[in-house]
Amino acid sequence: MNKRSTTAAISLLIALTAFAQQSNVNLSYNPQKDTEGLIPFSANLNSPQVNDDHTVVFRLRAPKAESVALSGAMTTVMGVRGNIPFTKGEDGIWTLTIGPLPVDMYQYNLVVDGVSMADPNNTYAAFTAMPPYSELIVHGDGPSWWDAKDVPHGAVTRHIYYSPVTQGQREIYVYTPPQYDPKKAYPVLYLMGGSGELPSNWMYDGRVNFIMDNLLAEGKAEPMLIALVNNQVIHRNHPQHADLTFDIMEREYREAVIPFVDSHYKTIANPHGRAISGLSMGGRHTMFVGLKSLDLFANFGVLSAGDNTPEQTLGEFLNDPKANDKVDYLFIGQGGAEEKGFFNMRVKGFRDALDKHGIEYEYFCIGETGHDWSTWRHLLYYGFLPKLWKK
């Protein structure tokens, strides 16, 4: 190879290396590492900057602000109560360094003079059913189990359907596994978010499609369809939300969601071929829709949810002498920080009632995470998904 060819090859290698490291070009496991020293497009600073030692630097240019603080899921694993203040420099740039943090994804906001907002310099932000927040991705030495690895990938299709229940157009996302065969009947997991989530949050925050791809590649789960369902069927701040949402959601499943999925995909169209699961409010939908609809579902995943008065709200299910015969799998999970706090009162109330009536279930508590996406991703990968359809 002559000198010109060698120089060209080296230049090409450098160019390709730089190209591969650009944020938002590839589905990188370390998109906030700042490998090129470039400021994100339309931003004025690099924030957050995630270092290989798992420390994180946040920056905000706000010369007229009187206070800036960090609020987010990382404070739970740090054992910090309340927000973490920034320090203001003479140049008007506020800075905060935290960590090292465990490898994970964290949601956060900045609190500027008492006003909570997404980080204006962070290109990773959530699209959700509540005011937006920013994403912090603390990387390890390579792709994690929630990342897009070099494995066969399934597909996610967004469908729009008309609901006679809500009398409008609604969306549903359906994951099909790698090597999906439209002639083969698959079991279906119907997966829901919480009070502030949209179906797409299970992909972008929950990474459920990548988690499922990786579990299948590792031989740890059964191939299945996953329907990401919009369980926002009445405004969350409606004064009768708690009284109406469960009945409306049951109708939505019976009259719209399940008929749509069964008519567009080849499914195992019986209770043993269906699972229902959700986080927080979606976990309560799982309880108060799913456990009251044993003609539809036989598998249940209750994530970060429960009830203080299950004898009244779930009396028919609890007193059914054939409940264990009708239920293939009942999973209950929460984060370690949740188990020590407010949310555990409902979870414990639900578990105590199940124990009293001899109803079988599996309980799974993960790490020191709180009421956030870190908990729900971990519960899917380590707990719920590997156990589905194994009975």
Where do the protein language model's features map onto the residues?
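Bacterial Sec-dependent N-terminal signal peptides
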Residues: 1-23
